[in-house]
């Protein structure tokens, strides 16, 4: 939980935004957590190759709003999660849709070398070329080699490319290789988009399922940015030391563009780190968490097939998934030094949070550790939208009544996620496996969160949580 002496939390928007596992860079401790019954690691294929040669889900617009009833078994209170219109984007008035949704075919299919037709290793000397043709062209140019003339116009392909060097070099020039266009490694974005646009229709004809998965990914992205007022793209950058001012307690406030002539309107209250007593602010945190639950519920009902599930299963999925989603999205507002608060207008340093009295000093540290590892994956909102949907549709949650339809939906989401990551991050071959590992890490973070919350509940006499949150925490891990 949070320190009862920290008013800033009232401003924190919680509604923001097997393969070779030894390749995972995160050295996480093993946890005794039940395995995912719907995650099939065997579907992940290795993306490493030997060095070559010389070296539809449709959006249900007719869905009616649903109130998800939580039976709190309380005599005087029965809470419900009611869907409310999402708040408009706070930090941006322009949608920032990922490039993955602009002419985006199944880009993980190998791009051919423009010279010999072998698999291209990258964008070299102005064209997509394999390692062999790249090295051949480089040596020819650097050493100023002159080959014996050939008038046969030899056909250059993978098996014959070493037979006639003259025709091979002429083919390099014909396809546009030039020393003036030298570029190694990743292809430029403009060239990538042009190439994807050229082969998009062909890929969809060869693999109609990929088109359905792209439609699903686009639908989830649109629902994501609509449901959550503060996404990763909308969040402001972390303080750079110039656009903010910092007090002696480790709290930073961004300068406001218009403060009403120097007034304190819109100012963010600063936290207090004194060791003594203070008024509890947990009710304010409860309000923020309830807002996050509403936003997550709004997004969940836009996942194709979710509203057709048993109502009790919908509630169970939301109950177990809400905090995993909150901590996933909170990572977008965190770095190794601190966390953005007050809808991005303030910054709370990590050192300040660690200086609080126990047990509150231990509250945020696991979230920082997770956020640092999670942010290293460099996901964008189009990736996160599908990942959040996968978290919600986890078929191994305790108490589910009808698991099969949940697993079917998650299987489709996992296929869409794998395609999305291969498309949006073609240079990160292990990304899908790493992201699945983060689902396990999230469960451990939530488990520790609940355990610490129970400790605070015993030590803080004035702790009070909204009945909805009490029901969520009840029997949670």
Curated annotation (Swiss-Prot):
UniProt cross-references to Pfam families, sorted A to Z: Hormone_recep, PPARgamma_N, zf-C4
Upper classification of the organism: Eukaryota, Metazoa, Chordata, Craniata, Vertebrata
User: Quaternary state and partners of this protein?
Assistant: Heterodimer with the retinoid X receptor.
From the UniProt entry, list the residue stretches annotated as the region Disordered: 231-281
Compartments in which it is found: Nucleus; Cytoplasm
Q: Which gene encodes it?
A: pparg
What is the name of this protein?
Answer: Peroxisome proliferator-activated receptor gamma
Keywords (A to Z) from UniProt: Activator, Biological rhythms, Cytoplasm, DNA-binding, Metal-binding, Nucleus, Phosphoprotein, Receptor, Transcription, Transcription regulation, Zinc, Zinc-finger
> InterPro entries attached here?
1Cnucl_rcpt, NHR-like_dom_sf, Nucl_hrmn_rcpt_lig-bd, Nuclear_hormone_rcpt_NR1, Nuclear_hrmn_rcpt, PPAR-gamma, PPARgamma_N, Znf_hrmn_rcpt
ZnF (NR C4-type) ranges:
113-133, 150-172
Q: Looking at the record's lineage, which domain of life comes first?
A: Eukaryota
Post-translational modification Phosphoserine, affected residues: 87
Which parts of the sequence belong to the NR LBD domain? 252-475
Portion annotated as DNA-binding: 110-184
Q: What is the originating organism of this protein?
A: Xenopus laevis
One GO cellular component term of this record is: nucleus
Q: State any GO BP term from the record.
A: rhythmic process
